Amino acid sequence: MARLVGVDLPRDKRMEIALTYIYGVGRTRSNEILAATGIDRNLRTRDLTDDQLTHLRDYIEANLKIEGDLRREVQADIRRKIEIGCYQGLRHRRGLPVRGQRTKTNARTRKGPKRTIAGKKKAR
């Protein structure tokens, strides 16, 4: 199993897909990385040479913010929004959807399970 920037890449997948196992790398960025390093995107991970693996590692470390660094940056951005008290920060603080989704119905993932209200009856 090839290990790249702290992530084990699956052996049997094509490189285009295998690179998406790294946090911060999707399909588009994966194809950009492979084009820049000159590696065929249909090549399987198990078929990579040590030289290609080293070239990939060097390119990713030099040009991309991924994994732990990216996670820390996202968390810092959220903390900053909460501290300055902007609308998005308030939504984060209250545990509600941040990007304008409706909350009268739905939004259960963000709001958690329904809480019953004592004394409230259904209207017929």
Swiss-Prot record:
Q: Which PROSITE patterns match?
A: RIBOSOMAL_S13_1, RIBOSOMAL_S13_2
Which Pfam families does this entry report, sorted A to Z? Ribosomal_S13
Name of the protein described by the UniProt record: Small ribosomal subunit protein uS13
GO terms for molecular function, please?
rRNA binding; structural constituent of ribosome; tRNA binding
Gene Ontology CC terms: cytosol; small ribosomal subunit
Q: Say which family it is in.
A: Belongs to the universal ribosomal protein uS13 family.
| Signal peptide (UniProt feature, chain positions) | none
Annotated segments matching region Disordered: 95-124
PANTHER family attached to this UniProt entry: 30S RIBOSOMAL PROTEIN S13/40S RIBOSOMAL PROTEIN S18, SMALL RIBOSOMAL SUBUNIT PROTEIN US13M
Q: Keyword Protein transport on this protein?
A: no
Q: What does this protein do?
A: Located at the top of the head of the 30S subunit, it contacts several helices of the 16S rRNA. In the 70S ribosome it contacts the 23S rRNA (bridge B1a) and protein L5 of the 50S subunit (bridge B1b), connecting the 2 subunits; these bridges are implicated in subunit movement. Contacts the tRNAs in the A and P-sites.
Q: State the Gene Ontology BP annotations.
A: translation
